[in-house]
Structures are given as structure tokens and as C-alpha cells.
Amino acid sequence: MLFRAMGYVIAAFYRFVHLHNYYDMKPVILEFCLSRGIKGTVILAEQGINATIAGSRQSIGEFFSFLDSDDRLRGMKYHESHSDREPFAKMKVRLKREVVRLGIDGFDCSLRGEYIDPRDWDEFVSSPDVHVIDTRNDYEVRLGRFKGAIDPGTSSFREFPEWARNWALDKERDTCVAMYCTGGIRCEKSTAFMRSLGFRNVYHLRGGILNYLETMRGDDSLWEGECFVFDDRIAVDRNVSPSEDIKCIKCAGEVDASDLRSVSKGNIMCWDCRLQA
């Protein structure tokens, strides 16, 4: 496979849409990706699609043209980033009960809150009346977050509903809440959950942290640190380039792509510290 100078094109996307035949879609999508050398993960559920894939510029373009053949997936917007090294080892298409697991059956994702565009985000969340909530896992938050954001301290997204219910106990339902995540899907679903609890003023960052960093590239912003990503890059910096300075949580030594297996469990540790754990 030939790649242009900037290397692999990485596309992250999702859509909440009813896919009654998602079981039948799996082999079709898998065969298409394998035939074009695309690698990554596509999650299919009755409530929609969630994916991050990587390949050549041509193959990624062909993939989205392929999605356009399905009216439900036509015009899919995606966040694009790049890597000089291959971000994924294989291509996987997984069937799930939820495209991102919140653990609540029959949950209405259409209740989502209002979008805030990246250029408007800093001003919006700087208001003392806005409660900014990071909906990601604790090990992601440790690498970086927006200044002043609330860290729920959850180890998985399934723990978020319990945290949110407890947090909401002493909050007025007209409290203004702004939420964010990596690419937009978790914060979109979590805003819907907050609205189901009765909160009326609920907002989320359009396209998540990745879209924010891409939009604000080179500008001063409220983002601090690195952004964890679920591929061999481990994290990206404020320029959306693969991070070169990821530290082990035990010894503060450098963690590289070969240590990714430890990151998958939320333990950002170098190999030596893993052996001693």
C-alpha cells in the first residue's frame, strides 16, 4: 500500500441511527475494509455505528463513498488525523448492544443536549455558572483535560450513570452543564442521560476534544496536557500529533507504543513497572 508523505489517514466517526440489520452489515463492511487494506475497529449496534479506521487517503475516501450507498449513513462526518506509523494491527467489526456502552436498556439517545462549537467553547465554559464535566475514564483524564473540568473518577463509561445520579442530588435542574469527551460520542450520549434526569441546560463540545484541538491548533486554549486515543499512538498533543512524552504513572519513565497492552486496562505503565506490579 502506498501512502503520501503524511502517512496513514485516521478517520473517527459515529452516528446514532436505527440499524435494524446491523448483523447483516458486519460481513459486508469487513470484506470492504480488508479488500482495501483498511484497519481499525467498527462497532455496530441497533442504535448506530461508532468507528475509528486507518488507511491510505484513497482507501478512506472509498470507504466513505461506500457508506454513502446506505441512506442511513450518507454524508457521514468524521474527524481526520494522521500518523507516520500504522495505528492498528488488524481490522475488526464488532456487534454490540450499544455503540458506546452506558449500560441502560431502552435509553433514548435523541434527548441529547445542544452543541457548542470549538471556537465558542472556551468562552462558554469560562462562565462560573457552567459546570464542565469530563465524561472519559480516569486514566484518560490523567493525561489531560480542560482547565477546571470535573473528573467523575470513573474507570469505565458504564459507571457514569451512577456518578451522575449522585452528583445531581443537590443540583437545581436549571443548572448549566457542559460535557466533553474524546470524539463526541460519549458526551453526546451522556448529555442525553443528564436530560433524562431533568436537567434542561445541557451542552456538549461538537466533535469532542479531537475536533477542538484541530480547530484551535496553535491558539491559546483551556486545554491542558495530552489527549488519550484508543490506538497505537496512545495520545496526541495539542497539535493532534502523536505524543512523544507519555509518562508511566509509576516511575514517570517514557511509555511508548510497545507498552500499549498495559494502557488498554487503564494502567499507563512502562513494561518494567508492569512486571513489578
Curated annotation (Swiss-Prot):
BP-aspect Gene Ontology terms:
tRNA modification
Which InterPro entries does the annotation name?
Rhodanese-like_dom (IPR001763), Rhodanese-like_dom_sf (IPR036873), TrhO (IPR020936), TRHO_N (IPR040503)
Superkingdom per UniProt: Bacteria
Query: Can you say what this protein is called?
Result: tRNA uridine(34) hydroxylase
Domain spans labelled Rhodanese: 126-221
Which Pfam families has this protein been placed in? Rhodanese, UPF0176_N
Functionally, this protein is described as follows: Catalyzes oxygen-dependent 5-hydroxyuridine (ho5U) modification at position 34 in tRNAs.
Reaction(s) catalysed by this chain, per the record, are:
uridine(34) in tRNA + AH2 + O2 = 5-hydroxyuridine(34) in tRNA + A + H2O
Q: Which Gene3D superfamilies does the UniProt entry name for this protein?
A: 3.30.70.100, Rhodanese-like domain
| Family recorded in the similarity comment | Belongs to the TrhO family.
One GO MF term on file is: oxidoreductase activity, acting on paired donors, with incorporation or reduction of molecular oxygen
Annotated active site residues, numbered on this chain, are: 181 (cysteine persulfide intermediate)
Q: Which organism is it from?
A: Anaplasma marginale (strain St. Maries)
Q: Which UniProt keywords apply?
A: Oxidoreductase, tRNA processing
Which NCBIfam families does this entry report, sorted A to Z?
Answer: PRK00142.1-4 (NF001136)
| Designated gene of the protein | trhO
The Enzyme Commission number assigned here is: 1.14.-.-
